[in-house]
Design a protein with these regions (language model features):
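Hydrophobic beta-strand-centered segment that forms part of the acyl-chain substrate-binding groove
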Residues: 65-116
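Short, Lys/Arg-enriched N-terminal segments with co-localized hydrophobic residues
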Residues: 16-28
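Catalytic strand-loop segment that frames the active site of acyl-thioester-processing enzymes
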Residues: 29-68
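HotDog/MaoC-like acyl-thioester-processing domains
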Residues: 32-34, 97-98, 109-175
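Hydrophobic residues in beta-strands and at strand termini
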Residues: 36-40, 92, 140
Length: 175
C-alpha cells in the first residue's frame, strides 16, 4: 500500500492515473489552449510584439499541448525520437501588444506516422479576436541515426495517440 492511511495501493494509483490520462487524450477537444502573457522584452520599438517571437510562441503552445496529451517532448526524446521542424508559416492578422493576454490553440492538420503538421490560432484572450495563424511541419527521426521513423512500427503507443487525436480533430472539423 502506497498511502496506507488513504487505502491506496500502487496498482490503484497507476490505474487511476492511466484512466485520467486516457480521458484527457479522449477529451483532446477540451484543451482550452495555451495562455501567454507577452513579456516586455518581446516588443519592438513600436510597442508591439516583434514578429520573430510568434514562432517561439507556437513552439511553447505545441509543447504545452503535447504535455496535455501525455506525450511531452522529454518522453518523446527519451524514446529516441526527435521531431525537427521542416517548415513554418505565420500570418499576422492584428498586432499583439505587451498588455494583451493571448490564447494559442493548437491542432494537428495532417499526420502520416512519419510526418506531422500543426496549425496554430492566436486569439486575444479578452476580445476573442483572431490575431495570428500559422503552421509548422515536422517529421520523426531516430535520435541516434537521424533516419526517418515510421511511428506505427517503431513506437505504436505514440503513434496511436497522434493518430487518434488527428482523427478526433478531423471529425470535429467536418461536423
Amino acid at each position: 500500500v502506497l498511502f496506507p492511511s488513504e487505502g491506496f495501493s500502487l496498482a490503484t494509483l497507476i490505474t487511476k492515473t492511466y484512466t485520467k490520462r486516457k480521458q484527457q487524450r479522449s477529451d483532446c477537444m477540451n484543451y482550452t489552449g495555451y495562455l501567454r502573457q507577452p513579456h516586455y522584452y518581446e516588443t519592438d520599438q513600436m510597442g508591439i510584439i516583434h514578429h520573430s517571437n510568434y514562432i517561439r510562441w507556437f513552439e511553447e503552445a505545441r509543447v504545452d499541448w503535447l504535455t496535455f496529451l501525455d506525450v511531452p517532448y522529454y518522453k518523446i526524446e527519451e524514446a529516441g525520437i526527435i521531431i525537427p521542424v521542416l517548415a513554418v508559416t505565420c500570418d499576422y492578422k492584428e498586432m499583439i501588444r505587451y498588455e494583451d493576454q493571448v490564447r494559442i490553440e493548437v491542432t494537428i492538420d495532417h499526420y502520416t506516422g512519419t510526418r506531422l503538421e500543426f496549425s496554430y490560432h492566436i486569439y486575444n484572450q479578452t476580445t476573442e479576436n483572431l490575431l495570428t495563424t500559422g503552421t509548422s511541419k515536422h517529421c520523426f527521426l531516430d535520435k541516434e541515426t537521424n533516419r526517418l521513423l515510421q511511428l506505427r512500427r517503431s513506437h505504436p503507443e505514440i503513434h496511436r495517440i497522434f493518430s487518434e487525436t488527428f482523427e478526433r480533430q478531423k471529425e470535429t472539423t467536418n461536423d
